[in-house]
Amino acid sequence: MKSNQFLGIAGMVLAMIACHKVEIIRPPEGGTSTPFSGKGTFKSNLLVQNRIPTSNTSPGDDESLVVSGDVGQYFSSTDFGKPSNPTKLPFLKSNTIAGLSLQPLPAGMKVVDYPGAFGVTADPEWNITSNWFKINPYEITYTGQATAEILQGNINSNRTLTADKTYLLRGQVFVNSGATLTIEPGTIIFGDSKPNDGILCINRGGKLIAKGTPEKPIVFTSPKLGTQRQRGDWGGIVVCGKAPNNKGTDVLVEGIEAGATGDGGKYGGNVPNDNSGEISYVRVEYAGIAVTPGNEVNGITFGSIGSATQLNHIIVSVGGDDGLEWFGGSVNARFIGLYDILDDDLDMDAGYTGNIQFVYSLRNPYAADVSLTGSLEITSSKTAGSSPQSAPVIANMTSVGPIYLVGEGAFNPNHEGGCRVSADARSQFINNVVIGWPRALMNF
């Protein structure tokens, strides 16, 4: 990674003028056209300094987009989030963007008068001056690694982790059906590194109550010290539930070893309002590993999580795979921060149907996964018509991409798109801000 702080000329020129360009991807010479399978709609979004604003969008699916190459036209500064200043936030000059009419939001989502995560100021619920809102973990130090209490194996009855101790996840730690793991505000949990990669897995019927506060967040982080810390130092968190997905009712989640016995790491069911607990005012740092090729643990993985579960105020930083990933389920999420994630910041698959609002994503321009990386990837199934079909709503997201951060030619070329929709997925991407991506919005 070059810095811890963190299609051609014609396309670049078109991205720099205030017009809307739709890219048509042609088949290879002598080939036949294959329809793209993503069915995303992109409305009322501000797109700034992207090489190509939209790819493979249909008329009516990309209404009220404002496209510009001038960051200074819309933002109160032109150095927010850059490697030299990663904690500076992208505040708008004005909440009103000429030519952009905000879309109505589904019931339960908060109505604000600006696109993106932040207007001219931050919504008070962001708590940007709190101990929780620490986007850049390189600036934070922890103690207690040597005296941490070891957590391993199975948790079969209710247990509480208290803030007067530190803890170390050793190997796969399962919270089994009928048990609730409660974590007090201010508690620090370290995840063991290889060969005992720490993974916390909440099984179906189990619950995690990780309810921090703005000044006493709960932190899951690396066991290493100072500059030794890096992405992939430990596994991550996995939560399994009983809500519907389109893969089945007994699916082994990614990142849990296939040898896991019993119900360990399996998700799926027919309980849309299933309750797996609460995760709020939590930070997850330096997580994300590949257990085997193509079988990765993310910062947090959600398998079939139901709508009664509470997800809010979560920051994932310096991740070795995706920040957050959903496989099916219907849980909603609000106030999410993502920094220096190797693969996708948010990944949704297998029939996920929740609503996500208030997301701030800041990329590391020098780090991207070889599988091609986006701020948001939405897929459903390789089998068209699988039910349920992924159909999330994403609103008030600000994604800060690599072109803005370091300029053309300087960033990792595996960065692809701000919001990418494929594999028979539907989505509504509305009232958002996308800055500095090779492609801002794309179906493929």
What do the predicted segments below correspond to?
Residues 188:
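Catalytic metal-binding/acid-base residues of hydrolase active sites
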Residues 17-18:
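C-terminal motif of bacterial Sec signal peptides marking the signal peptidase cleavage site
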Residues 7-14:
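Sec-dependent N-terminal signal peptides
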Residues 24-182, 192-205, 217-321, 325-342, ...:
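Extracellular beta-rich repeat passengers
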Residues 211:
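Conserved H-D interstitial segment of serine endopeptidase catalytic domains
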Residues 1-7:
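Bacterial N-terminal signal peptides that target proteins for export
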Residues 21:
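Short, conserved catalytic or interaction motifs in soluble domains
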